[in-house]
UniProtKB/Swiss-Prot annotation:
EC number assigned by the record: 2.5.1.61
Gene that encodes it: hemC
Complex and partners: Monomer.
Molecular function via GO: hydroxymethylbilane synthase activity
Coiled-coil region: none
EC class: transferase
Function: Tetrapolymerization of the monopyrrole PBG into the hydroxymethylbilane pre-uroporphyrinogen in several discrete steps.
The organism of origin for this protein: Geobacter sulfurreducens (strain ATCC 51573 / DSM 12127 / PCA)
PANTHER family: PORPHOBILINOGEN DEAMINASE (PTHR11557:SF0)
Family: Belongs to the HMBS family.
Superkingdom, natural source: Bacteria
A GO cellular component annotation in the UniProt record: cytoplasm
Full protein name: Porphobilinogen deaminase
Pathway: Porphyrin-containing compound metabolism; protoporphyrin-IX biosynthesis; coproporphyrinogen-III from 5-aminolevulinate: step 2/4
Length: 318
């Protein structure tokens, strides 16, 4: 039975509101007469804008306060960018839908110069350590500048901070209609995307069957299998969204191919591997690929990045 009213928790950034409004619109189309309310919530990641996310530390910088509101019963569902969602949830909450993925690639924005034609020592603005590591691996001469802020702010920094280029997720630019500023889209073999990049996740209270049934139509099976594989890899590597780990899954028929990457922040040491198997084994494939990456040098790289040991073995939760 469809609900009469649904409250959506969301961050207040332009992109987060676009995403939440898209979910609202789809709900209203499917359930005419349903009252859908957006509840804006400020997260710690929104409040701390002058420090790189990797230095803020911790997991769930963009979801914790939203989850707390859900546990208090103030909202019914939350809409997240999947790349911001930690691999573990507070008791009673969970990810119940993963939407069809928008373009998962990274977008390169410059004054018309492609990545291949960047001058020596060019300054590149990015918010992600995984982008930094991958691009320094092929161009160690580049100077990486960590930038924060919403999509428009980051685009402006190209001019304001006299940068040669900035790199953002293509999905956000496409959703907000900023594709005209993109110089090129970086191929995934150059810049492997963040875990879950381009997909949205819908979280709710696991015991709220009415809500679960109401939002179930958002789930896109191929995207869900790919993203679950990526997240299983991240979980096994004990990574948050601010470590130099990347993974991208692609589904073809009943088969899933997953590529994973672990690197030191400066890109001097890295390991990259792929694995294929049935989509029904998506999480097992993610964990198997993580084990392979860790065994081939990823363990030592991450121990240095985290400045602590990474588990040699990790119990899979039931």
């Amino acid at each position: 039975m469809a609900l009469n009213r649904l409250r959506i928790g969301t961050r207040a950034s332009q992109l987060a509101l676009w995403q939440a409004n898209w979910v609202k619109s789809e709900l209203e189309k499917r359930y005419p007469g349903m009252e859908v309310e957006l509840v804006k919530i400020k997260t710690i990641g929104d409040k701390i804008l002058d420090v790189p996310l990797a230095q803020v530390g911790g997991k769930g910088l963009f979801v914790k306060e939203i989850e707390e509101a859900m546990l208090r019963g103030e909202i019914d569902i939350a809409v997240h960018s999947m790349k911001d969602v930690p691999t573990e949830f507070p008791e009673g909450l969970g990810l119940v839908c993963i939407t069809e993925r928008e373009d998962p690639r990274d977008a390169f924005i410059s004054n018309g110069v492609t990545f291949a034609n960047l001058p020596q020592g060019a300054k590149i603005g990015t918010s992600a350590l995984r982008r930094q590591a991958q691009l320094l691996k092929v161009r160690p001469d580049l100077e990486m500048v960590i930038i924060r802020g919403n999509v428009e702010t980051r685009i402006r920094k190209l001019t304001e901070d006299k940068l040669d280029a900035v790199i953002l997720a293509a999905a956000g630019l496409k959703r907000l209609g900023f594709t005209d500023v993109v110089t090129e889209y970086l191929p995934v073999d150059l810049s492997l995307p963040a875990i879950g990049q381009g997909a949205l996740g819908l979280e709710c209270r696991l015991d709220d069957q009415a809500v679960r049934e109401t939002i179930d139509f958002f789930n896109h099976p191929d995207t869900a299998h790919a993203v679950r594989a990526e997240r299983a890899l991240l979980w096994r590597c004990e990574g948050g969204c601010q470590v130099p780990i990347a993974a991208h899954g692609q589904v073809s028929g009943d088969s899933l191919t997953l590529t994973g990457f672990i690197a030191s922040v400066d890109g001097t040491r890295s390991v990259k591997e792929s694995i294929s198997g049935p989509v029904t084994d998506c999480e097992k494939l993610g964990i198997a690929l993580a084990e392979k990456l860790l065994a081939d040098g990823g363990h030592e790289i991450l121990a240095e990045v985290y400045q602590r040991e990474v588990s040699r073995e990790k119990e899979i939760p039931v």
